[in-house]
Amino acid sequence: MKYERCGKSGVLLPKISLGLWHNFGDVNDYNKCREIIRYAFDHGITHMDLANNYGPPPGSAEETMGRMMQDDLRPYRDELFISSKAGYEMWAGPYGNWGSRKSLMASLNQSLKRMKLDYVDLFYTHRYDPETPLEETLQTLVDIVRSGKALYVGISRWPYEATQFGYEYLRQRDVPCLIYQGRYNLFDREPETTGVLQQAKENGKGFMVFSPLAQGLLTNRYLNGIPEDSRIANGGHLKKESLTETTLKRIKALNDIAARRGQTLAEMAIAWFL
């Protein structure tokens, strides 16, 4: 595995990380999850990316990670870089969502308990909160680092101007933002058009890509219809409406290009952003 410096920090991260968004919850077979995580770690994927609401159900991916720490990974904690996030709806009531100090602090405490950890290496604000003052959210990140519950902090899916404010706020308090996370793939190049990709580079931040395969659209999974065990068929975040006739034509065209390159579509999609 090749490792790359994260922006202008001292952190080296693997070129490919393992995200535990949809396939590591209670609805999935634990032994299969365990096999995947062990395989990734054995091949140099040291970064495991989670969030409080990953599952399904919400929280269960972190519980899976906690079982892995207990069963296999505890002796290797210092070789792992584990991230989590908070900002999407997690529990009922006014404090289980968004970016208030109350919500972020409570969420991180719950995440640490589920994962059986004393700290996370990286904690993100998971999305922009238009109602909570930016200063409140950002100062909470500062205080989380100073409390020792996270070593670094990151921003995920914030708009350009709010992100720039966040970079400056955190830098001035000696808790610089390590990384920006955004969805980026051959079908979704929004980080280019909004400017947040270039912004991260100019500010010396890393950029973490999520959904590089567009939840499986950029693979051979849907070339010949919708498989019964696919994410679309299971009615999750990827809707049947996503696979339009136009999209399918694009998938097949990209698959042809990949074949001429001697690659699978998934391999080409990952190579594109690497």
Protein language model regions, located:
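Alpha-helix N-cap and loop-to-helix initiation/capping positions
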Residues: 28-32, 60, 64, 95-103, ...
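Short, acidic/polar
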Residues: 27-41, 99-115, 163-167
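Phosphate/pyrophosphate-binding loops at sites that engage ATP/ADP/AMP, CoA/4′-phosphopantetheine
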Residues: 73, 109-118, 262
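Beta/alpha (TIM)-barrel catalytic core signal, keyed to glycine-rich beta->alpha loops juxtaposed to Asp/Glu
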Residues: 130-274
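Short, well-ordered coil/turn segments that N-cap beta-strands
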Residues: 11-16, 44-46, 74-80, 117-121, ...
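Conserved, mostly hydrophobic/aromatic
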Residues: 6, 18, 33, 40, ...
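N-terminal binding-site loop/beta-alpha segment at the start of enzyme catalytic domains
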Residues: 1-80, 146
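N-terminal small/glycine-rich loop or linker at the start of catalytic domains
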Residues: 7-25, 83-96, 119, 124
